[in-house]
Amino acid sequence: MNEFQTESFVSLKPYDLVKVNRGAYVGSLEARASDPIPPAYIFEGPGTLITTAGQYSLVRWHLIPAPDVWLATAQLEAYSED
């Protein structure tokens, strides 16, 4: 299993709970290739980091029936229930 560091220097590994960092996502290539208004659940989390490949991670969302999605690992941050 691969382990990557995000821009916030938080090490993420498979099966960690994650959410998308809004500042890193908005205006990114992934955001431009998606819906103009991103769904709130990606910023609220939690999602499970399933696997990584290169600079991307596959995330599975928990709260709604949504397809798994590949996102840049640098756009992810650890989920906390704060």
UniProtKB/Swiss-Prot annotation:
InterPro entries noted in UniProt: NdhO (IPR020905)
Source species, domain of life: Eukaryota
Any one annotated GO CC term: organellar chromatophore thylakoid membrane
Pfam families given in the database record: NdhO
Class of this enzyme: translocase
Main location: plastid
Compartments, record wording: Plastid, Organellar chromatophore thylakoid membrane
Membrane topology summary: Peripheral membrane protein
Any GO molecular function: oxidoreductase activity, acting on NAD(P)H, quinone or similar compound as acceptor
Enzymatic reactions: a plastoquinone + NADH + (n+1) H(+)(in) = a plastoquinol + NAD(+) + n H(+)(out); a plastoquinone + NADPH + (n+1) H(+)(in) = a plastoquinol + NADP(+) + n H(+)(out)
Signal peptide span: none
EC number(s) reported in the record: 7.1.1.-
Key words of the record: Membrane, NAD, NADP, Organellar chromatophore, Plastid, Plastoquinone, Quinone, Thylakoid, Translocase
Family according to the record: Belongs to the complex I NdhO subunit family.
Assembly description: NDH-1 can be composed of about 15 different subunits; different subcomplexes with different compositions have been identified which probably have different functions.
Main function: NDH-1 shuttles electrons from an unknown electron donor, via FMN and iron-sulfur (Fe-S) centers, to quinones in the respiratory and/or the photosynthetic chain. The immediate electron acceptor for the enzyme in this species is believed to be plastoquinone. Couples the redox reaction to proton translocation, and thus conserves the redox energy in a proton gradient. Cyanobacterial NDH-1 also plays a role in inorganic carbon-concentration.
HAMAP family in the cross-refs: NDH1_NDH1O (MF_01354)
Name of the featured protein: NAD(P)H-quinone oxidoreductase subunit O, organellar chromatophore
